[in-house]
């Protein structure tokens, strides 16, 4: 969630209808109160009581040991594969912590970057861009790879070039890896979306009626069954694909909390990480400390409901981008916008580019690589996450439209997709939300998504079909999460968030018994780390002193 190299977004705090108010308007709760010793769930005593062997590890490069004092320490701990059978198979969870830089350590702050399927180990390596100096001084910041991911016991699939743990970085910058660097390498702040473009061409095929809907579903089913068989053949232990649900991850997180020495979990979760945090607070309200959920997921939504919300969100964000491009805001110095006319015309020009590239892919600087419409659509959608990087998207579109050259689109696509893991993403989501509907209802949803989002509706649809084909399904029906008895939970929502629409943050804050909504009137996905001092100060104040923002606090950008 880097603030970015292209723009610094300055926020001004406004109370709802009450003029300017300070970010910390409610009396501070002071240091985290001494807590009674957290209870250990029956049968899990050996896991909660295990000894953690922390070792010095490299500042970058995952869990690699270091002979130097880098300020980072790593460890792996053991948890049950199946919490209903704790005496059975076990798996490992990898942790990496950045030691508090201040003299008065307040404990540990656990963080999750989203996904599902993204690495908290990688996230904490970027602590200086992910977390403020205030938070770095106060806390040991611990990132962990959830079960099924990265350096933990991971879902492993053969990508055709040898076995790879799902979520393992393939080089370049992962979509949840806002590491400072060149403008290209820093192009995408994060992409922890509940739904992303599927890897199979059939996900987009048929959007213009090229094939029948039942044929589209047949193709999706075939592809996802093949992918599941591939992953099942390479993943060990064999039962892992049935135990990567978020409830299990939340139970792992409580083990990690206990092993850190804290009686309360302090937590910062982004996007999917908000769902994990809410599940944790519901399971362990007495163990919940200071929790911030940024870019919230509404737990009442079905797979289809989430997809529909995102389809509308991305289409709205696309129009906002076009307006800023045409007004000269989303361009680099000395560059023009290739999108002519009004916003409607500009959106149509992007759609026309996608359609044209599907028919005749664009050449690139590499004679062996071309760029099709699906790649362009994916780049456009991914770069809508971070408005500070819209000038890079403009440059890529300008090259593609005016020169028929997809070179820069391909560069951005490679950066945006490095380290992504479609199998883990579906393995988790399909276990979290049961399949609903049938081919008839899916086609209705598909047509509705095409209507509300002509640009992205097709690629975001048919999530239930994919999960049905994947075959590892959950039974936990979508329902409100209340987390009764938990400490205050700060829910941060961005009004122009395409991936987790603002309405989702409103819904989660309303559902949580102790939820409080903090609003950023900005564009892009999530707010903390990429908005401005209003949001940052409010979040930091809560995490470090327990100060809850004024109810209804809204932070405006650009003032």
Residue ranges and their predicted role:
Residues 119, 251, 269-281:
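Glycine-rich nucleophile elbow surrounding the catalytic serine of serine-hydrolase chemistry
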Residues 521-527:
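Histidine-bearing beta->alpha loop at or near hydrolase active sites
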Residues 488-496:
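Conserved strand-to-loop "acid loop" that flanks and positions the catalytic carboxylate
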Residues 2-3, 46, 173-198, 346-487, ...:
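Alpha/beta-hydrolase fold active-site neighborhood
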Residues 498-503:
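Conserved alpha/beta-hydrolase "acid-adjacent" motif
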Residues 156-197, 279-349, 395-404, 415-416:
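A catalytic-pocket lid/entrance helix-loop region that shapes and gates access to the active site
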Residues 250-264:
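Conserved acidic catalytic loop of the alpha/beta-hydrolase fold
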Residues 2-7, 15-205, 214-218, 344-350, ...:
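Catalytic-loop region of hydrolases
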